[in-house]
């Protein structure tokens, strides 16, 4: 957690080894945003829920992957999108239209962060994915300061290597003045590996979607492909600093059974109710990801990782501590804690009896 601040310049970083393997890819996006945004460079932490003082850190619920009409694959207006999240008591969202930055629009209670989903759908990527040869390089630039007009052209079309393609996206994030980089649905059509994710993190990405509710099968993996949790642990064991996000990748806001409906995955950030503070807390890993579980504590304290489910939350819960890629403890109940190891990391996964989950970020000494 302490090391995360060193990477707050989310869009820049060092060189890393190249991953190997091959994958193919056609073209078809699925990530974007809307038309309302608040300028928000990086820096800072926490926010409130009711009416807490402006300087008080509170838990803030938000989505870092949202689409609107400007994305090309959603029919909802920006106003409609903002209204949907406001009505459900979200505190913030990031507008991430495909290869487009929507100019900021203010005057809403919902904090709207400017962003873009850099989208490239080539074929035949390396490492390989499945036999379809489809490949999806989708990267969110969050909290951008630049406002390019029209479509952003950024893709490296002269390589088949995923790492080089991701590097092109990271470079574009720098050009856009992004505060954070998020890797979206990395297992879509497979191809992501722990060493590749670690290399991408080393080059500047701080967030990765562990759970994208539109891609459940890809998140969970199968007999031939690792889950995103497994890939995340692999990257963490290689020393990477990268935080796990849950998102709805929303495109549909009217029909809950439509294609890519809103809701179902989000992050809850400990920060002040301020755009820069929210971005700073995301960069520092001061948040948990959720598909329905509500936590009141998810933080290190006195050398331990402490996890507590809200006292009024219904259902039964299992809290699992994963230490250096292996299940270290399993507690049935609403609260648990585990000592932070001298070497490596520990993270937690909370599962409710209905299948809803919360991912607590890894901590190190």
Residue ranges of predicted features:
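N-terminal membrane-anchoring alpha-helices
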Residues: 17-20
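N-terminal low-complexity, Pro/Thr/Ser-rich intrinsically disordered segments
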Residues: 25-64
């Amino acid at each position: 957690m302490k090391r995360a601040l060193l990477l707050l310049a989310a869009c820049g970083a060092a060189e890393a080894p190249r991953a190997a393997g091959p994958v193919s890819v056609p073209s078809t996006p699925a990530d974007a945003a809307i038309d309302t945004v608040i300028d928000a460079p990086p820096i800072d932490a926490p926010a409130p829920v009711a009416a807490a003082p402006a300087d008080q850190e509170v838990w803030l619920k938000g989505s870092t992957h949202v689409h609107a009409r400007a994305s090309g694959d959603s029919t909802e207006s920006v106003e409609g999108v903002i209204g949907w999240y406001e009505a459900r008591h979200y505190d913030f969202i990031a507008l991430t239209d495909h290869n487009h930055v929507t100019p900021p629009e203010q005057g809403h209670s919902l904090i709207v962060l400017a962003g873009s989903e850099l989208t490239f759908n080539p074929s035949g990527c390396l490492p390989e994915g499945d036999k379809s040869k489809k490949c999806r390089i989708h990267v969110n630039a969050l909290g951008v300061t630049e406002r390019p007009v029209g479509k952003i052209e950024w893709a490296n079309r002269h390589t088949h290597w995923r790492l080089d393609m991701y590097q092109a996206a990271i470079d574009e994030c720098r050009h856009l003045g992004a505060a954070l980089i998020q890797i979206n649905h990395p297992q879509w059509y497979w191809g992501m590996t722990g060493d590749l994710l670690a290399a991408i993190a080393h080059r500047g990405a701080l967030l990765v979607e562990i759970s994208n509710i539109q891609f459940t099968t890809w998140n969970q993996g199968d007999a031939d492909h690792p889950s995103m949790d497994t890939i995340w642990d692999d990257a963490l064991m290689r020393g990477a600093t990268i935080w796990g996000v849950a998102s709805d990748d929303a495109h549909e806001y009217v029909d809950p059974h439509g294609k890519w409906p809103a809701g179902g995955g989000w992050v809850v950030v400990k920060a002040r109710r301020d755009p820069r503070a929210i971005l700073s807390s995301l960069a520092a890993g001061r948040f948990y990801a959720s598909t329905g579980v509500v936590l009141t504590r998810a933080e290190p304290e006195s050398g331990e990782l402490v996890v507590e489910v809200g006292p009024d939350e219904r259902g039964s819960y299992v809290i699992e501590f994963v230490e250096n890629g292996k299940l270290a403890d399993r507690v049935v109940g609403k609260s648990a804690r585990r000592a932070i190891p001298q070497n490596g990391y520990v993270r937690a996964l909370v599962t409710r009896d209905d299948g809803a989950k919360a991912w607590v970020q890894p901590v190190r000494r």
